[in-house]
Swiss-Prot record:
Gene from which the chain derives: MEIS3
Segments of the chain annotated as binding DNA: 262-324
Skewed-composition ranges (Low complexity): 227-241
Source species of the chain: Homo sapiens
Name under which the protein is recorded: Homeobox protein Meis3
Spans annotated as Disordered: 25-51, 197-268, 329-348
Family of the protein in this entry: Belongs to the TALE/MEIS homeobox family.
Keywords, comma-separated and alphabetical: DNA-binding, Homeobox, Nucleus
Composition bias, Pro residues: 31-46
Transmembrane domains' residue ranges: none
Function: Transcriptional regulator which directly modulates PDPK1 expression, thus promoting survival of pancreatic beta-cells. Also regulates expression of NDFIP1, BNIP3, and CCNG1.
MEIS N-terminal domain location: 96-179
Length: 375
């Protein structure tokens, strides 16, 4: 660390000593600078030749405090160009450590003082040189403190930036959880209603003529989708039950508020909201794309935002409507479902009744009056 000046690399073309200074003429014109004109190089003091310069350099390099000065200078370079990894910095710390902290410098001074005192005194016989070395170490120490402030500001900025990013990320997590909840809500539809894709066009046409869909518990003669999905409803909000059509009492309102808060934390929509949007979806299967006004009305009815309603219908078209189309294309029985709402085949206008009953499932039939019956 405390290399001699003669051992340091010298570059070709650079002449050291008084000869280099003597090569400049004394009549060099003064060049204006930001702080006034520059003075031409002054001749060396009498008696200061190359031997005198070498002797003074040897005194500086041989001073007891020079190793500490070189160490602080090296720490300044490392603190400027190397990232910090949080490791403690002391004597022998590899490059890239936390070299610009106050604790590191204090440890270096303590270790250096302990090492030097056991060998030789800290000062030389030249008080002027001692003062120069101390001032140089202090200047580098101030430089380290300023670098430490810069690192602290950088750490503070990074911490605040990461905190801001973490505050934004739960939105994506909520959307992902909501997609998972919608997947659980809609998984039972293709399995519980395998014959529904073959007959949904007639159901849509009849209910569009009537202008509404009954969300309450239907009677024996009109047991339909609401009845079946109501029987198969789960805790996640499956089915169209009577809670949509009937008013709630004070206790039920309290339960709904608690359920809404709980579902909000879990990223799942309330049961009432999903029932309303699911009813609209099955009522408009011919064109399951609500307009902006319809989205606004659904948002008011469900208590959700327009963006949440829009995302729910995007997921519903992917997880409900598309599986119904795929199921209809795979089975090939009855009237295949088409997104335009027109039956591809399977019945004619003269047919009074259409019924499909796959093996191992509950059969359902739909007559031309728009009434569902269990087989």
């Amino acid at each position: 660390m405390a290399r001699r000046y003669d051992e340091l690399p010298h570059y070709p073309g650079i002449v050291d000593g008084p000869a280099a200074l003597a090569s400049f003429p004394e009549t060099v014109p003064a060049v204006p600078g930001p702080y006034g004109p520059h003075r031409p190089p002054q001749p060396l003091p009498p008696g200061l030749d190359s031997d005198g310069l070498k002797r003074e350099k040897d005194e500086i390099y041989g001073h007891p405090l020079f190793p500490l000065l070189a160490l602080v200078f090296e720490k300044c370079e490392l603190a400027t160009c190397s990232p910090r990894d949080g490791a403690g910095a002391g004597l022998g710390t590899p490059p890239g450590g936390d070299v610009c902290s106050s604790d590191s410098f204090n440890e270096d001074i303590a270790a250096f003082a302990k090492q030097v005192r056991s060998e030789r005194p800290l000062f030389s016989s030249n008080p002027e040189l001692d003062n120069l070395m101390i001032q140089a170490i202090q200047v580098l120490r101030f430089h380290l403190l300023e670098l430490e402030k810069v690192h602290d500001l950088c750490d503070n900025f990074c911490h605040r930036y990461i905190t801001c990013l973490k505050g934004k990320m739960p939105i994506d997590l909520v959307i992902e959880d909501r997609d998972g909840g919608c997947r659980e809500d809609f998984e039972d539809y293709p399995a519980s209603c395998p014959s529904l894709p073959d007959q949904n066009n007639m159901w849509i046409r009849d209910h569009e003529d009537s202008g509404s869909v009954h969300l309450g518990t239907p009677g024996p003669s009109s047991g339909g989708l609401a009845s079946q999905s109501g029987d198969n409803s789960s805790d996640q909000g499956d089915g169209l039950d009577t809670s949509v059509a009937s008013p709630s009492s004070g206790g039920e309102d309290e339960d709904l508020d608690q359920e809404r808060r709980r579902n909000k934390k879990r990223g799942i929509f309330p049961k009432v909201a999903t029932n309303i949007m699911r009813a609209w979806l099955f009522q408009h299967l011919s064109h399951p794309y609500p307009s902006e006004e319809q989205k606004k009305q659904l948002a008011q009815d469900t208590g959700l935002t327009i963006l949440q309603v829009n995302n729910w219908f995007i997921n519903a078209r992917r997880r409900i409507v598309q599986p119904m189309i795929d199921q209809s294309n795979r089975t090939g029985q009855g009237a295949a479902f088409s997104p335009e709402g027109q039956p591809i085949g399977g019945y004619t206008e003269t047919q009074p009744h259409v019924a499909v009953r796959p093996p191992g499932s509950v059969g359902m039939s739909l007559n031309l009056e728009g009434e569902w019956h269990y087989l």
